[in-house]
Amino acid sequence: MTAVQRRSAIYEQLTHADAPISATALAQQFSVTRQVVVGDIALLRAEGHSITATPRGYMIPAETGLRRTIACHHSGADTQRELFAMVDCGCTVLDVIVEHPVYGQLTAPLALSSRYDVEQFIRRMADSHAQPISALTGGVHLHTLSCPSEAVFAHLKATLAGMGMLYD
C-alpha cells in the first residue's frame, strides 16, 4: 500500500467511525509507526479535511445539531458532575476553552457524548494526575456544545444554573 492509499484508507475509516480512532490503532492496522499516522493526519488536514484530535483519538466532526457556547465556573472536583449534566441533557461536549492572560484563547477538544465518554476522560485525568484546563482561570471556562435543539440547550442552562455552575 502506498502512502497516498494509506491516507485515503485512514480518511475513509475516520469518516465511517462512530467513535474516535487512536493513532496507535491506525498504526497497528496499517503496519506503520504512530508517528507515520500523525504525519498522515497532518497531510490530510493540509489537504483541507476537517479532522479533530481528541483525547481518545482522531475523528471527523459531526455536522449535526446546534452549536452553542456556554460559560461555566466550578472547581476541578465538579468537572464530572458538569460533564454528566451536559451529556445527560443530550448534548455533545465538543471542547473546553479558557482565556489565558499570555497565550490568549486556549481550546482543548473533548468530543464527549455519553457518561462512558465522561468516565473515560475523568479516569485519564486522574491517572495522569492532571488538572483541568480551567484550573488556569480559577474554574472559569467555556464549552462548545452540539445540542439537538434550542429547548435542550435552554434545559441544560437551567440545569447548570441550578447546580451553581453557570457563569454569567
Predicted regions and their residues:
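Short, hydrophobic-biased segments on the C-terminal half of alpha helices
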Residues: 41-42
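Mid-protein regulatory/catalytic core that forms ligand/cofactor-binding pockets
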Residues: 65-168
